[in-house]
UniProtKB/Swiss-Prot annotation:
GO terms for molecular function: malonate-semialdehyde dehydrogenase (acetylating) activity; methylmalonate-semialdehyde dehydrogenase (acylating, NAD) activity. The gene is iolA3. It catalyses: 3-oxopropanoate + NAD(+) + CoA + H2O = hydrogencarbonate + acetyl-CoA + NADH + H(+); 2-methyl-3-oxopropanoate + NAD(+) + CoA + H2O = propanoyl-CoA + hydrogencarbonate + NADH + H(+). Keywords: NAD, Oxidoreductase. The lineage of its organism: Bacteria, Bacillati, Bacillota, Bacilli, Bacillales. Catalyzes the oxidation of malonate semialdehyde (MSA) and methylmalonate semialdehyde (MMSA) into acetyl-CoA and propanoyl-CoA, respectively. Is involved in a myo-inositol catabolic pathway. Bicarbonate, and not CO2, is the end-product of the enzymatic reaction. It comes from Geobacillus kaustophilus (strain HTA426). This is Malonate-semialdehyde dehydrogenase 3. InterPro entries: Ald_DH/histidinol_DH (IPR016161), Ald_DH_C (IPR016163), Ald_DH_CS_CYS (IPR016160), Ald_DH_N (IPR016162), Aldehyde_DH_dom (IPR015590), MeMal-semiAld_DH (IPR010061), MSDH_GmP_bac (IPR023510). Homotetramer. NCBIfam families: MMSDH. It comes from the Bacteria.
Length: 484
């Protein structure tokens, strides 16, 4: 029997075994098989990573921007060459089906491509002759050592939001990946090193609460980017800000899709099924609430159930599978409790994912679950379940549908299905969410646009990706000069 390997930290360009003596297993969510062990590193090990990043920053900040861009271009090429390998690794440790994982790798590669355009992104501004023989200009500079804390649900894409752009801007980086999906982060570091990244520019420290606390409080870390649940995001924001750090903390969601009476129901149902049950509903842009407007509700619910009944559940590496497992047995149990709560609070359980055959074997499976006649204020409407559970709320008209969506404490994304330009305009102007979709399944923007929403879905001022990302990872210097 082969011994399960324990992952190492990546500090100062070296793979270093943790000395904490604490670790957790990393199971395959589809089978329960142990893939690896992940160390729960100590504060001292984090300190070593920050020290390595601080030392590397002294030289990395001086590397010409075009040379940094060439390393990013080479990194992008290596990611493309290893696309299939990376997608399979995502499926193994996260559980999402291969097609979803393949698309996630594509999104990560797009983030690296965006970061490779750093010569243009780092350009400042200049105004000649603000007075006689005097000109003024703005220049961008890196912050120093920055850190990222990433979630389990996108082990490829979310880290690639963070460290490629931060490093391209001239910073050095400390990454704390999710202890539930830590394997891909190590592979990303290996490929970045192969691309020519100098030692200490990217560091990885595996762990949990102790490492997170150290990141938020460390005096040499200038900025923290976080993606995760709402309570933790709020804690990260408040704690890091109290220690003088720049913070962006992307949090939870309860995304509503409004289906109007004139909607193309075939398209709407296909999109909603993909958005609600793709990646087992474990994504912050998942559709978790459908607002059916007018007299289409019964037909819409019937079609949603029929489509959900056709979904194949199983191991994400098997052909034809659409829905893989959730991340852990504890998450499956949590989802089952929410289904029980939905029934107790009076929602109509149209499709019960607890009864699907795949849920009784090994792995952490829960089938597609649909509730109808859900009322705003019910627990399954209020809470982010983060699982393949879809709630259908009924509304008289668009005004009521928008009012229902805007009552949520979250404001990440929202969609509308309609051919009415008037309805689309009203939706765009009145809905309180950061990322909007019109007749699309998941309105997640490309890497060159900012990502995230409002209210309890985001804490901070500058969002991830796009120009916001460059602003987050740089500071400005204004220079006014007189020429004599």
């Amino acid at each position: 029997m082969t011994e399960t390997k324990t992952l190492k930290n990546f500090i100062g360009g070296q793979w270093v075994a943790s000395t904490s003596g604490k670790e957790e297993v990393v199971p395959n969510p589809a089978t329960g098989e142990v893939l690896a062990k992940v160390p729960l590193s100590s504060r001292e090990e984090l300190d070593a990573a920050v020290a390595a990043a601080k030392e590397a920053f002294r030289e990395w900040r001086k590397v010409p921007v075009p040379r940094r861009a060439r390393i990013l271009f080479r990194y992008q090429q290596l990611l493309v060459e290893h696309w299939d390998e990376l997608a399979r690794l995502v499926t193994l440790e996260n559980g999402k089906v291969y097609e979803d994982a393949y698309g996630e790798v594509q999104r990560g590669i797009e983030c690296v491509e965006f970061a490779a355009g750093i010569p243009t992104l780092m350009m400042g501004q200049q105004l000649p002759d603000i007075a006689t023989d005097i000109e003024s200009g703005m220049y961008r500079y890196p912050l120093g050592v920055v850190a990222g804390i990433t979630p389990f649900n996108f082990p490829m894409m979310v880290p690639c939001w963070m460290f490629p752009l931060a490093i391209a801007c001239g910073n050095t980086f400390v990454l704390k990946p999710s202890e539930r999906t830590p394997m891909l982060a190590n592979r990303l570091a290996e490929l970045f090193t192969e691309a020519g990244l100098p030692p200490g520019v990217l560091n990885i420290v595996h762990g949990a609460h102790e490492v997170v606390g150290g990141i938020l409080e460390h005096k040499d870390i200038k900025a923290v980017s976080f993606v995760g649940s709402q309570p933790v995001a709020e804690y990260v924001y408040k704690t890091a800000a109290a220690h003088g750090k720049r913070v962006q903390a992307l949090a939870g969601a309860k995304n509503h899709s409004i289906v109007m009476p004139d909607a193309d129901l075939d398209m709407a149902v296909t999109n909603i099924i993909n958005a609600a049950f793709g990646s087992a509903g474990e994504r912050c842009m998942a559709c978790s609430v459908v607002v059916a407007v007018g007299d289409i509700a019964d037909e819409l619910v019937r079609r949603l159930k029929e489509a959900a009944d056709r979904i194949q559940i199983g191991n994400g590496l098997d052909k034809g599978v659409f829905l893989g497992p959730v991340i852990r047995e504890s998450h499956k149990e949590r989802t089952i409790k929410y289904i029980e709560i939905g029934e107790k609070e009076g929602a109509l359980l149209v499709r019960d994912g607890r009864r699907d055959s795949a849920t009784s074997g090994q792995g952490y499976f829960i089938g597609p679950t649909i509730f109808d006649h859900v009322k705003p204020g019910m627990t399954i409407w209020t809470d982010e379940i983060f699982a393949p559970v879809l709630s259908v709320v009924r509304a008289r008209d668009l005004d009521e549908a928008i009012e229902i969506a805007n009552r949520s404490e979250f404001a990440n994304g929202a969609c509308i299905y309609t051919d009415s330009a008037k309805a689309i305009r009203q939706f765009r102007e009145e809905i309180d969410a950061g990322m909007l979709g019109v007749n699309v399944a998941v309105p997640a923007p490309m890497a060159f646009f900012p990502f995230s929403g409002y209210k309890n879905s985001f804490y901070g001022d500058l969002h991830a990706n796009g120009r916001d990302g460059v602003e987050f990872y740089t500071r400005k210097k204004m220079v006014t000069a007189r020429y004599q």
